[in-house]
Design a protein with these regions (language model features):
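N-terminal, membrane-interfacial amphipathic/helix-forming hydrophobic leader that caps
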Residues: 1-92, 105, 109, 113, ...
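Helix-boundary and loop/linker segments of multi-pass membrane transporters
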Residues: 17, 86-90, 125-135, 170-172
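Non-cytosolic membrane-interface motifs at loop->transmembrane helix junctions
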Residues: 49-58, 126-128, 198-209
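Interfacial segments of alpha-helical transmembrane regions
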Residues: 86-103, 176, 182
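Alpha-helical membrane-spanning segments of integral membrane proteins, especially the hydrophobic core
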Residues: 93-101, 128-144
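Transmembrane alpha-helix/helix-exit interface in multi-pass inner-membrane proteins
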Residues: 101-121, 149-156
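Transmembrane helix-loop-helix hairpins at the membrane interface
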Residues: 109, 134-245
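Membrane-interface interhelical connector segments
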Residues: 116-133, 159, 165
Length: 245
């Protein structure tokens, strides 16, 4: 009589994903309100330190966006950014990203020429570089690397997928609606503190076109890799020339 083979341990049940439009709405509305609050504080003289202003200009957007992504993933989702929001990279994403980033930056530059009569008016304006840790973080890492990671996780990860899942339509239609909504919200967050009507439509049009292209490649591939590379290129083509100017 042979001993019975012990049964393999049962795999833990998959976590039930409960994130959706409410998580995305909290992040987007929170970012808009904090941007407006920071703009009000700056205009009323409560913020005077240039470095503090520059740091807050990033944090008021990043904190609510990244916070909503992390809450959705680790408290209400699968605890995997790859499964929940497509944070994956394939070598082909490099080609997607370079192409989209270059083309959308050209389109955004055409909007600048139409609105201002020249390129670069809406780009970065930087003082003489100090080449210290602050300069490296605020002038290079923040706009070129950190912003693409956080913003793509939210806009093309959480928001796009939440809208697609909530749209009562066939998948191609749901994805098209989700791409348009994510691009609109992306543009809105970038123009909520626009200083003039011209800046409003120039920046709004450029960011909407980029957002639509990034959302489309994400919808096609199911990954954020291409959108993140495109975002790095799109921002880098503004920041790097400003640094070399």
């Amino acid at each position: 009589m042979t001993a019975a083979t012990p049964a393999a341990p049962a795999s833990p049940p998959a976590r039930r994903v409960r994130w959706g439009l409410d998580d995305a709405a909290v992040g987007a509305v929170g970012a808009i309100l904090l941007v407006l609050a920071a703009d009000w504080a700056l205009s009323h003289g409560y913020l005077t330190d240039p470095r503090l202003v520059e740091v807050l200009s990033y944090l008021v957007v990043w904190v609510p966006l990244l916070g909503s992504v992390l809450v959705a993933c680790y408290l209400r989702g699968s605890r995997s950014l790859a499964r929940d929001f497509g944070l994956r990279f394939h070598p082909l994403d490099l080609l997607w990203g370079l192409t989209i980033g270059l083309l959308t930056r050209v389109v955004a530059s055409l909007f600048e020429i139409a609105g201002y009569g020249q390129m670069g008016t809406t780009g970065a304006t930087l003082d003489a570089p100090a080449h210290d840790a602050w300069w490296i973080v605020l002038a290079l890492l923040a706009p070129v690397l950190i912003a693409p990671l956080i913003e793509e996780l939210f806009f093309r990860g959480l928001l796009l997928r939440a809208v697609a899942a909530a749209t009562d339509a066939r998948r191609p239609v749901a994805l098209a609606v989700a791409c348009a909504v994510s691009a609109l919200v992306f543009a809105l967050v970038h123009v909520v503190d626009a200083g003039s009507p011209t800046a409003l439509w120039v920046v709004g049009a450029g960011t909407f076109v980029f957002g639509l292209a990034a959302a489309s490649v994400t919808a096609v591939t199911g990954r954020l890799g291409g959108a993140m590379v495109a975002h790095v290129v799109f921002n880098g083509l503004v920041v790097v020339p400003a640094l070399l100017r």
